[in-house]
């Protein structure tokens, strides 16, 4: 009698384990993977090709002329003879990542050489940018220029990068290094929106050795 009970118990246990296994397998099979998101909780565009950016490297930079909040114009033509760092970003809406990078660039002694110009390119109206300075006063130390209607960002293929939180409309978190002859030597797009001063300094060091 006990043997019959033990056999029945074993059979029941096997059936239960098998049923649980089927439920787990079925659940994992039907599970939809959550999309990768950036630090702002926005989906990262995974099908974005870096080809348009790579095609700009070692070619003459698109012409630009951008003004800071005081109306001073910074143009590619007038900056010939200097190495240029352009940091294309979303500006006001990209807090704190883009703001932190803008401040980091402004405070870095390695970029205060007279042969180097660092421009943080935002798409906000100049009057609106004052709100950011009020919230983070260190931003006043940076050279921020304003890209009306994102026209220059578009010329540099900055509106369809993996870092763009508003794909096709606004830039994200992308760096461009232009040499003294106006040729693009380095482009880096970062969906993680980290600080990249060391990488930029290394790229400028390469230019000084050429």
Named regions from a protein language model:
Residues 1-60, 210:
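N-terminal targeting signals for export/organelle localization
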Residues 61-62, 83, 172-174:
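Short loop/turn microsegments at loop-to-beta-strand junctions
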Residues 74-105:
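Short active-site neighborhood of thiol/selenol oxidoreductases, capturing the structured segment around
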Residues 96-155:
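Structural microenvironment flanking redox-active thiols in thiol-disulfide oxidoreductases
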Residues 140-143, 158-176:
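Structural micro-motif
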Residues 167-210:
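Thiol-/selenol-based redox modules, centered on thioredoxin-like
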């Amino acid at each position: 009698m006990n043997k019959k009970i033990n056999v029945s118990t074993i059979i029941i246990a096997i059936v239960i384990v098998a049923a649980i296994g089927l439920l787990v397998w079925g659940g994992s099979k039907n599970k939809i993977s959550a999309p990768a998101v950036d630090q702002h909780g926005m989906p990262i565009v995974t099908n974005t090709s870096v080809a348009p950016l790579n095609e700009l490297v070692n070619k003459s930079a698109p012409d630009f002329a951008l003004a800071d909040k005081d109306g001073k114009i910074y143009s590619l033509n007038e900056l010939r003879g200097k190495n240029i760092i352009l940091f294309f970003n979303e500006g006001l809406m990209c807090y704190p990542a883009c703001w932190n990078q803008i401040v980091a660039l402004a405070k870095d002694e390695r970029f205060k050489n007279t042969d180097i110009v660092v421009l943080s390119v935002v798409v906000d109206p100049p009057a609106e940018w004052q709100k950011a300075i009020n919230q983070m006063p260190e931003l006043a130390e940076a050279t921020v220029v304003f890209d009306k209607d994102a026209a220059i960002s578009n010329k540099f293929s900055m509106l369809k990068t993996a870092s763009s939180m508003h794909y096709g409309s606004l830039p994200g978190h992308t760096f461009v290094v232009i040499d003294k002859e106006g040729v693009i030597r380095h482009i880096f797009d970062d969906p993680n929106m980290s600080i990249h001063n060391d990488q930029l300094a290394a790229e400028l060091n390469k230019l000084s050795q050429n």
